[in-house]
């Protein structure tokens, strides 16, 4: 099983950063790789079990299911249902933690998935650098860091 871990510090209070990322349908509002998103069946975007169907700027389409969401613990866990990446059993968590020294937020994004062994290095690098770090870089720009 492949594992990805990326972390960063965002120069903004955790409640403000969480307000930006908690909407399971809101990735186009903060992640530069996402062109559009919709929740299937008209479900609320914070209902565990809802499915988002989104399109990347490169045209690829991905479907993901919300597995967990906590405003108290500031995390969102989701699974990929369909993706052109060639991964299986993909589960990821985006978690925010307040930094007590100043108004900053520790952000971490993790994932575990199965893939062909010969593609693991490439997929881990693309997910870590393109998806996770790309999202953190956009958040840092949005919050002045």
Report residues per predicted region.
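Hydrophobic ligand-binding cavity/cleft-lining segments
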Residues: 1-44
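A generic structural signal for beta-strand entry/edge sites
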Residues: 1-3, 73-75, 102-104
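Hydrophobic/aromatic beta-strand elements that line small-molecule binding cavities or substrate pockets
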Residues: 6-8, 62-68, 91-98
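Short beta-strand-to-loop capping motifs
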Residues: 10-12, 56, 115
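Short strand-connecting beta-turns/loops that link adjacent beta-strands
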Residues: 13, 59, 71-72, 99-102
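Glycine-rich portal/gate segments that line the openings of hydrophobic small-molecule binding cavities
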Residues: 29, 38-86, 134, 138-145
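Beta-strand/loop substructures that line and gate deep hydrophobic ligand-binding cavities in soluble
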Residues: 80-134
């Amino acid at each position: 099983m492949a594992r990805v871990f990326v972390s960063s510090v965002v120069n903004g209070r955790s409640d403000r950063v969480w307000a930006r990322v908690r909407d399971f349908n809101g990735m186009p509002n903060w992640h530069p790789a996402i062109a559009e998103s919709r929740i299937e069946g008209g479900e609320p975007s914070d209902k565990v079990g809802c499915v988002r169907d989104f399109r990347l700027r490169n045209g690829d389409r991905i479907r993901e299911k919300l597995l967990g969401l906590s405003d108290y613990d500031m995390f969102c866990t989701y699974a990929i249902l369909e993706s052109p990446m060639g991964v299986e059993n993909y589960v990821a968590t985006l978690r925010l933690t307040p930094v007590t020294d100043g108004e900053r937020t520790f952000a971490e994004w993790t994932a575990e998935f199965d893939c062909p062994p010969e593609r693991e290095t490439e997929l881990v690098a693309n997910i870590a650098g393109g998806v996770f770090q790309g999202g953190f870089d956009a958040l840092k720009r949005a919050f002045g860091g």
